[in-house]
Amino acid sequence: MEQNWFFPPHQGIRLGDLANQIGAELLDISAADRTVRAVAPVYRAKPGDICYMLSRKNREELQTCRAAAIICDKAISSLVPDTIPVLLTSKPHTAFALAGTLLHERAMRPSYNTSERGVAPEAFVDPTARLEAGVEVEPMAVIGAGAEIGSGTRIAAGAMIGQGVRIGRDCTISAGASILCALIGNNVIIHPGARIGQDGFGYAPGPKGGMIKIVQVGRVIIQDHVEIGANTTIDRGTMDDTVIGEGTKIDNLVQIGHNVRIGRYCGIVSQVGIAGSTQIGDGVMIGGGVGVNGHITIGDGAQIAAMSGVASDVPAGERYGGIPARPMRDFLRDVAEMALRSSERQKKKGGKDE
């Protein structure tokens, strides 16, 4: 890949210092003064780059690697050529993530859209809104009446912050996002096009066969260190709040219904849909394309496999998959049984479809 001007390399960190900061052991102390400037994949890492390897199946990539160092565990370290210093750790994935935050701090948040700082003259800030010192508002953003925004927060171009919304400190609200009826904590990242705080989907049968809209007068509460992906939608509560717990990370194109409560440090992958009033515990991981029924509970630490349909409660710590979702061991047994029956059926027919 040619030089990437979107994310320029770091001015340089000593390899020895980097090892200390990411909690890894530098096996070759004589390499401590090498300079590291960027991250790169193993196969094209060059001097100044740092890379990592998790699996032996990629060992061939080491033949073209010229990295300043490689992060790996003990099982991989024996494969690394003597010319490449090893940063040894039992958690190479985590160590590499930490290295990336140090070398590419600018890439950790959505980029600026303008070179200006402060409040752009093309932005609209209602006279009753309160902005702490250090807030940045890009052109065409709108800050509604009575909104409050903490210092260090950046509101990107075209974003809309509704009346009375509270946003904490050091947040990033990206281009084109809209936030209504919400209280947002500190160090929250909201990516482009996200929609937060709009009406939930609630209707009652009408007297003549139509539908009557149920009023949605709740809020959205987003706690500290949450990240919300592009074009994700989070509806406000009907009468209670929709809550996203501290440290939870939500991918792009996720729909979260009204009154949903998501715990702390959860991971929710793209195209998940969570129906209203479902409660999700702490540390829950939900794979891509999962549908979650409303008014159910998913316990702490549960894991849901991609493309599953969760129709009923999931106990804490369990791994569920399939449609309807069930314990993973049962799901895999059912899949194996169906594959066996299909194979036997094909044999009886001589391998030809009817």
Curated annotation (Swiss-Prot):
GO molecular function: N-acyltransferase activity
InterPro entries: Hexapep, Hexapep_transf_CS, LpxD, Trimer_LpxA-like_sf, UDP_GlcNAc_AcTrfase_non-rep
UniProtKB keywords: Acyltransferase, Lipid A biosynthesis, Lipid biosynthesis, Lipid metabolism, Repeat, Transferase
GO BP terms, alphabetized: lipid A biosynthetic process
A Pfam cross-reference name: Hexapep
Superkingdom field: Bacteria
Reactions catalysed, as given in the entry: a UDP-3-O-[(3R)-3-hydroxyacyl]-alpha-D-glucosamine + a (3R)-hydroxyacyl-[ACP] = a UDP-2-N,3-O-bis[(3R)-3-hydroxyacyl]-alpha-D-glucosamine + holo-[ACP] + H(+)
Family matches, as SUPFAM superfamilies: Trimeric LpxA-like enzymes
Active site: H258 (proton acceptor)
Role summary: Catalyzes the N-acylation of UDP-3-O-acylglucosamine using 3-hydroxyacyl-ACP as the acyl donor. Is involved in the biosynthesis of lipid A, a phosphorylated glycolipid that anchors the lipopolysaccharide to the outer membrane of the cell.
NCBIfam families assigned: lipid_A_lpxD, PRK00892.1
Protein name as annotated: UDP-3-O-acylglucosamine N-acyltransferase
Native source organism of the sequence: Rhizobium meliloti (strain 1021)
Gene: lpxD
